[in-house]
Design a protein with these regions (language model features):
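Transmembrane helix-loop-helix hairpins at the membrane interface
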Residues: 2-9, 24-34, 153-284
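Hydrophobic, small-residue-rich membrane helices and short re-entrant helix-turn-helix hairpins
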Residues: 132-148
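Alpha-helical transmembrane segments with an aromatic anchor "belt"
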Residues: 71-77, 143, 209-211
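Residue-level signature of transmembrane alpha-helical entry/exit and packing/kink sites
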Residues: 15, 19, 43-47, 78-82, ...
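Short, well-ordered beta-to-alpha junction loops that form the rim of enzyme active sites
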Residues: 91, 144, 273-276
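N-terminal, membrane-interfacial amphipathic/helix-forming hydrophobic leader that caps
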Residues: 1-133, 283
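Alpha-helical transmembrane segments of multi-pass integral membrane proteins
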Residues: 82-96, 117-126, 148-165, 185-192
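Transmembrane alpha-helical segments in integral membrane proteins
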Residues: 127-134, 199, 203-205
Length: 284
């Protein structure tokens, strides 16, 4: 089955060379970021681990195939809704984190007018639209498939991070910031994992269906997700280069989480793996 998994991945690369080239370019830039920050070993380990997890995910999917699918009724219309939602979310992020705008000194009426856009920064607005379109949780990937995969991914991530880059571990910081283990889990799984993975599953399935190319829809969605972090990072040190490189740096882990969703046809494994990502191997 190991050989079959390698052949499966090779076939998928041949079928979608454009997506492969985009991933390869991202990997090259990620290695450059590691070199630039004197963390080349960490960046190489990070990239290898993301591929290794994709291999484990494919192996599991070949051994335990599922007939479940993601329902997409109107690809063009729903892709438009997805793009509109993230655009409105970006508008809020701009006003909230732009160094040229003092949020606290902003006119009260303007702030009140902008506050509803929070619904689109977090995908609450997107979720409401999916409900109005009569999608059920099962249609959007809320299934129990593939939960066994969270065990090797979390354990291997923790072990490798401890060995290769113990200084990048974020567990203690997250626990301190959120007031304890329960707070860290709630913040990670609900605020980050659920909201961001829901955003990505809607995007990659709709864009993929509209373009008739899952791989491209997958990459574009993760690219959007990654760069939605840029406004906040830029506001912290006003370094546009590092904000851009930082966004590119998290694309590989974002791709892995979204691939986990795609192959298991369930959002729950990626929500848990994302939400318990206290290791920080991608931080360099």
């Amino acid at each position: 089955m190991i050989k079959a998994t390698f052949l499966f991945q090779k076939t998928k690369i041949k079928e979608n060379l454009l997506t492969f080239l985009l991933i390869l370019t991202t990997a090259i830039v990620t290695i450059y970021i590691g070199y630039r920050h004197d963390t080349l070993k960490q960046s190489l380990t990070y990239l290898f681990l993301m591929w290794f997890f994709s291999f484990i995910i494919d192996l599991y999917a070949l051994l335990s195939p599922t007939k479940d699918t993601f329902l997409v009724r109107q690809p063009k219309r729903e892709s438009f809704y997805f793009i509109a939602c993230f655009t409105l979310g970006l508008v809020f992020l701009f006003f909230r984190f732009s160094p040229s705008i003092d949020w606290q000194q902003l006119n009260g009426i303007v702030r009140i007018a902008l506050l509803p856009l929070i619904l689109f920064m977090f995908p609450i607005g997107l979720a409401i639209i999916m409900v109005l379109l009569k999608y059920k949780p099962n249609d959007l990937g809320f299934r129990l498939n593939g939960l066994i995969l969270i065990i090797p991914i979390i354990l291997i991530s923790a072990l490798v991070n401890r060995i290769v880059s113990p200084q990048s571990l974020t567990y203690d910081v997250l626990v301190a910031e959120t007031g304890g283990i329960l707070g860290a889990l709630f913040s990670g799984i609900i605020a980050a994992g659920l909201s961001e993975e829901f955003f990505k599953v809607v995007g990659q399935t709709r864009l993929g269906a509209y373009m008739k190319n899952f791989g491209l829809g997958w990459f574009i969605t993760v690219f959007i997700w990654a760069f939605m972090h840029a406004p906040k990072w830029y506001s912290e040190d006003l370094n546009m280069t590092e904000a851009i490189l930082g966004s590119i740096r998290i694309i590989p882990i974002g791709l892995m989480w979204s691939y986990l969703t795609h192959r298991t046809k369930s959002i729950l494994p990626s929500v848990i793996v994302h939400g318990t990502n206290f290791w920080g191997l991608q931080n360099f």
